[in-house]
Amino acid sequence: MLNHDEKQLIKHAWEKVLGHQEDFGAEALERMFAVYPQTKTYFPHFDLHHDSEQIRHHGKKVVTALGDAVRHMDNLSEALSELSNLHAYNLRVDPVNFKLLSHCFQVVLAVHLADEYTPQVHVAYDKFLAAVSAVLAEKYR
């Protein structure tokens, strides 16, 4: 999966996310809804307008969960087990949506980290978020 250097890049970049979880999460969700409007079907009860309290709250939950994954990179299955159960059995979210949100989150990182979002950081986050998406989709099999 990730080598030592990639893990260090992820952890270092994550330090820039801390304190901005709600903003980054809301921005990623707003991007996902704009670029992939079919994802809105999973949020029929949400106010999907820019800067809505519901999007901000859920965005913070998403990015907080990613922070847990960053802290437990070597054991993602255990760290994300409850979240995987929730999305597979209760919410029944199509697993392709994890990849869509991952892509949008990477765009948010690139915008906010600017020059610090190097190609190496991009590759590391691409691999990391693909692993997170795969773990979240494990219960669908």
UniProtKB/Swiss-Prot annotation:
Domain Globin span(s) in chain numbering: 1-141
Keyword Oxidoreductase on entry: no
GO cellular-component term (any): blood microparticle
Molecular function terms from GO: haptoglobin binding; heme binding; metal ion binding; organic acid binding; oxygen binding; oxygen carrier activity; peroxidase activity
Keywords assigned by UniProt, alphabetized: Heme, Iron, Metal-binding, Oxygen transport, Transport
Tissue/organ expression: Red blood cells.
InterPro entries for the chain: Globin, Globin-like_sf, Globin/Proto, Hemoglobin_a-typ, Hemoglobin_oxygen_transport
Superkingdom of source: Eukaryota
Any GO BP annotation: hydrogen peroxide catabolic process
Transmembrane segment boundaries: none
Range of residues in the leader sequence: none
Binding-site residues, heme b: 58, 87
Keyword Metal-binding: yes
Classification via PANTHER family: HEMOGLOBIN FAMILY MEMBER, HEMOGLOBIN SUBUNIT ZETA
Quaternary structure note: Heterotetramer of two alpha-D chains and two beta chains.
Known role: Involved in oxygen transport from the lung to the various peripheral tissues.
Family of the protein in this entry: Belongs to the globin family.
Protein name: Hemoglobin subunit alpha-D
